Each structure stands twice: as structure tokens, then as C-alpha cells.
Amino acid sequence: MWKWILTHCASAFPHLPGCCCCFLLLFLVSSFPVTCQALGQDMVSQEATNCSSSSSSFSSPSSAGRHVRSYNHLQGDVRWRRLFSFTKYFLTIEKNGKVSGTKNEDCPYSVLEITSVEIGVVAVKAINSNYYLAMNKKGKLYGSKEFNNDCKLKERIEENGYNTYASFNWQHNGRQMYVALNGKGAPRRGQKTRRKNTSAHFLPMTIQT
């Protein structure tokens, strides 16, 4: 390559003295690596840009999928269950609308239909008494013949695997009020309940048919 440069320099500038040709040659030689280096950097930069855009386009669908994925929790779902409390009672709604707990696992009033009415919001209805589980603004549990706002309960799965059911419409001093049965199977007032209270924890048990 250097032979070619010397030959062409000599033919292109025959009128220049030898020393000038030498200086010209040195100039060309010194500038050539810089040009190659700049060209190499441009190529590397271009490859990096292409790789970056390629990587971005490749990872985009998966990352988008994580955000787009739907978590419509049991919306429109209907389940038949018995709600077994952490205090060892089955929640019942009797034929007169009274809410209580029983140790009898075969009690017909403990058979409940749990229906999702909104995302994370359910209605609980006793099949044999035809009453809905309801909580009024004072935190009292009662059975309602008609579905109303008192019957909307927020269902949440807790860390221990049990569920909690809080009034969707009513709070007490900014705090949630929960469905709960005390150690004697009696319903607790919503004002005295907290999400961490085990008396408000229920295990939905599948009904064997």
C-alpha cells in the first residue's frame, strides 16, 4: 500500500522537490489512521445504535405485556361456599335474617352463594334463607331480602390465605369495617374490627355436592 502511495505521489506531483514529497507523504500517513479510527468509531456507534433499537423492539412486547395483562378478579363469577372463620365458626344467615356463627358444618343456612358484582367486590347470599349478608353504616351485620349498597363487600385475600370482607360503602372514622365473628360465634360491630384481626378472617370452603 505504501508503495502505491509513493508511486502515485511521485506521478501526481512531478514538479515538487523530493523533500516536499516526503512532507506530503508524512502528512498523508499521519492522517490516514485518524480517518480509519473515526470511520471505525462511526461503524461501532452505528452498530450499537442498531443493536439498541433492535433490543428495544425485541423487549418491548414482553414489557408491554406485563403492564397490559388484565387482572379482572373473578368479575361475574358465582361460587357456592361456606365461610369458615378463623375462630372456628361457619357464618350463617338464618331464615329470620339473623347473622351468626355455628359449629355445625352441615347447617343449611351456612351454604352461601358468593357473586362478584365488580372487580374485587362481592355479594354474599344464603341459599336456604334467601338473605344477603349486609352491613349498615353503624357496622351492624344483618340479612337483607333485597340486594342494596349495604350488601356490597370488598373481598381481599390476606397473607395467611384467609379472606376478609369489608363494607364497600361504609367506614368508621376513615377505617374499613369488616365482617367478623368473635370467639363465641357472635357477629362483631364493624367499628371494632381491623383487617389484621383474625376474627375477621374467613376461609371459603368448597361445598361437596
Curated annotation (Swiss-Prot):
Keywords tagged on the record: Glycoprotein, Growth factor, Secreted, Signal
Subcellular location: Secreted
Positions annotated with a glycan in the UniProt record: 50, 197
tRNA processing among keywords: no
Gene3D superfamilies: 2.80.10.50
One cellular component term from this protein's GO annotations in UniProt: cell surface
Subunit structure: Interacts with FGFR1 and FGFR2. Interacts with FGFBP1.
Function: Plays an important role in the regulation of embryonic development, cell proliferation and cell differentiation. Required for normal branching morphogenesis. May play a role in wound healing.
Protein name: Fibroblast growth factor 10
Naturally occurring in which organism (per UniProt): Mus musculus (Mouse)
Lineage summary: Eukaryota, Metazoa, Chordata, Craniata, Vertebrata
Record gene name: Fgf10
